[in-house]
Amino acid sequence: MRRCTNIRPGETGMDVTSRCTLGDPNKLPEGVPQPARMPYISDKHPRQTLEVINLLRKHRELCDVVLVVGAKKIYAHRVILSACSPYFRAMFTGELAESRQTEVVIRDIDERAMELLIDFAYTSQITVEEGNVQTLLPAACLLQLAEIQEACCEFLKRQLDPSNCLGIRAFADTHSCRELLRIADKFTQHNFQEVMESEEFMLLPANQLIDIISSDELNVRSEEQVFNAVMAWVKYSIQERRPQLPQVLQHVRLPLLSPKFLVGTVGSDPLIKSDEECRDLVDEAKNYLLLPQERPLMQGPRTRPRKPIRCGEVLFAVGGWCSGDAISSVERYDPQTNEWRMVASMSKRRCGVGVSVLDDLLYAVGGHDGSSYLNSVERYDPKTNQWSSDVAPTSTCRTSVGVAVLGGFLYAVGGQDGVSCLNIVERYDPKENKWTRVASMSTRRLGVAVAVLGGFLYAVGGSDGTSPLNTVERYNPQENRWHTIAPMGTRRKHLGCAVYQDMIYAVGGRDDTTELSSAERYNPRTNQWSPVVAMTSRRSGVGLAVVNGQLMAVGGFDGTTYLKTIEVFDPDANTWRLYGGMNYRRLGGGVGVIKMTHCESHIW
C-alpha cells in the first residue's frame, strides 16, 4: 500500500501521490493494531449463480442470442454458451457473421437434443437414455461438448448386447468414438457365437464382416463356426453376396478345419464348388492337412490358430497410500494378458481399506482418506466398471481393518477408529443392506489380516495398539465365538494373508523394529505354523491373493520405498520371483479376486 504522511485537515481533496511512500500492502504502520482476517469461499455461489442465470434465460431476460433449430427458437446468453462449448466460443468471439447476429440458425442438429444440451449448459444436469442417445451424441460432437460425448458413450457401453453390439459399433465409428468402438469390437469378438445369430450380423456389409472374422481373438469353439457364419451371411442375400464369397472366404481359416468337415461340408457346398477362387482355397487347406511335412512352408494368416481371450480370475488392487497421500485409484491385473490396467476409481480416497469379494462384486470397507477415518463402504461391479456408494456404512469408523467373506456375509474385523484399537467384529448382509455386530475378538487388533478356511474366520496378527502380535484367533459362526489357536512364529502387523493349497499363508508385515520379508503358513490339521522361504523384498502393508492358482504378494513398503512390484510364490521350487508391477505404488491397499464369467475385464 502507499503510506501517507503529514496530511493536514482540509487536504483530503488534494493529490497526495507525491506525499505517499511504497510499503508492504498487507502491513499497517507500527503501533496500529492488525485487523482480524477471515478468508471466505462460498460453496453455494456457483450453483446459486447458475440457478439465477437459468431463471433469467427462462424469462428471456438479458438474453443476447436466439438459436434457431428447425422450428424451435431457444433464448440464451452468449457468455454461458461460450464458456461451455468451444463451438459457440469460436462462433461468438471470432469474425464470423454469427458473432454480430441476434438470431443464429444451427443446422444438422436435432431440436430436442439442442434443448437438452442448452439446459445442461445452465444446470450441469442431463439424462441420457435410449430415446435420446442417438441424437444427443451427434449434437454433442457438433458442439464439442466432450463431457456429454463421454456420458453418451458410457451409456452405450452399458447397453452392449449380442443383439445390438454391431449397431453400436457402427454408431461409434461414425462419430469417431474410439474407446466405444474398441469396446464394441472386443464385445463382438468375445460374444461372436451369439452375435452371428443376430439380425445385425446378417445386415453387415462385407468389409465389416471381414474385419470381425479376421481377428485372432474371435471367440469360437472351432473354425467350423466361422465358416457356417459366413455361409449364413452369404445366403441371407445370395444374389448380391455370392460374388463377394471368395473375398470373405479368404479370411476363414480353412486349414484349421477337420478333414471330415473340409471335405464333407465345405468342399461339397454348391456355392464353393461353383467358384474357382473358393475351390483354390479348399485345395490349399487340403494340402496343409495332407502334407504335414510341408506345413512350415505354408504358414500364413489362414494357418494361424485363433487365440480368443478366455475368461478367468482377475486381481484388483484398491486404494492405498502413494506419494504422501491416500489414493482412490483402482487397477486390475489379468494373468492372461499379463497387463495391469486402470479401472474406475472409488469415490473416496482410502488407505488401510479392507477389500473382499461377495457375489462377484468387490467391496471396499472403511480406511482413511488422508484426513478422516471412514465408516463408508463402496461396491464395484466389473460388468459396468462402476462403483456404488449405496452400501450401508459400518457401525464405527475403521482403518487397517480386515475384511473377508464367510457364509454369504461380509465380515469387518478389528482396525482402529482414530481413538482406539478395535476388537469389534460386524458382518454385512447384502440382502438386507445391513451390518450386524457379532462376537468381539478377545484381543484388539489393528493391521490385522483375515482369512476363511474350513468354515471358520481367522484373525491373524496385527497390533493391539502397543505392540505387534503373533497371536491368532478363529471365529466359529455356528457358536458365535472366537477361539485362540497356535500363534505365528513372528509378530506381524500390516501383513498379507491368504488361503493357498488348504493352508493359511502369512507374509511380510512389520514387527517391533522393521519391515519383514519372511513368510509362514498354518496347517489347520496340525494346528501348527511353519516357516516358508522369504520374499525377495521386505513388505509391510502388503496385499496377498491367489489368482488362477498362483499366490501373489502385491505392493507394500520396504522401509524406504513404496512398492508397486509383485512377487509370485512357486511351491515346487520353494521360491518367490518378481512378476512385473502395478501402475501405482501402494502401501495399505486392498486386494480382491473376481472370477470373470463373461470376459468383462478384457472389455473395459
UniProtKB/Swiss-Prot annotation:
Subcellular location(s) per record: Cytoplasm, Perinuclear region; Nucleus; Golgi apparatus, trans-Golgi network; Cell projection, Axon
Consequence of gene loss (knockout): Approximately 50% of mice die until day 28 of postnatal development (P28). Mice that survive beyond P28 are indistinguishable at birth, but show a progressive corneal dystrophy, associated with an epithelial hyperplasia and an altered corneal epithelial cell differentiation.
Domain BACK intervals: 165-267
Name recorded for this polypeptide: Kelch-like protein 20
Function recorded in the entry: Substrate-specific adapter of a BCR (BTB-CUL3-RBX1) E3 ubiquitin-protein ligase complex involved in interferon response and anterograde Golgi to endosome transport. The BCR(KLHL20) E3 ubiquitin ligase complex mediates the ubiquitination of DAPK1, leading to its degradation by the proteasome, thereby acting as a negative regulator of apoptosis. The BCR(KLHL20) E3 ubiquitin ligase complex also specifically mediates 'Lys-33'-linked ubiquitination.
Pathway: Protein modification; protein ubiquitination
MF-aspect GO terms: actin binding; type II interferon binding; ubiquitin-protein transferase activity
Listed GO biological process terms: Golgi to endosome transport; negative regulation of apoptotic process; proteasome-mediated ubiquitin-dependent protein catabolic process; protein K33-linked ubiquitination; protein transport; protein ubiquitination
Naturally occurring in which organism (per UniProt): Mus musculus
Highest taxon listed in the record's lineage: Eukaryota
Subunit structure, as described in the record: Component of the BCR(KLHL20) E3 ubiquitin ligase complex, at least composed of CUL3, KLHL20 and RBX1. Interacts with PDZ-RhoGEF/ARHGEF11, DAPK1, PML and CORO7. Interacts with F-actin. Interacts with IFN-gamma (IFNG). Interacts (via kelch repeats) with IVNS1ABP (via kelch repeats); this interaction blocks the assembly of CUL3-KLHL20 complex.
Gene giving rise to this polypeptide: Klhl20
Matching Pfam families: BACK (PF07707), BTB (PF00651), Kelch_1 (PF01344), Kelch_KLHDC2_KLHL20_DRC7 (PF24681)
PANTHER family: KELCH PROTEIN, KELCH-LIKE PROTEIN 20
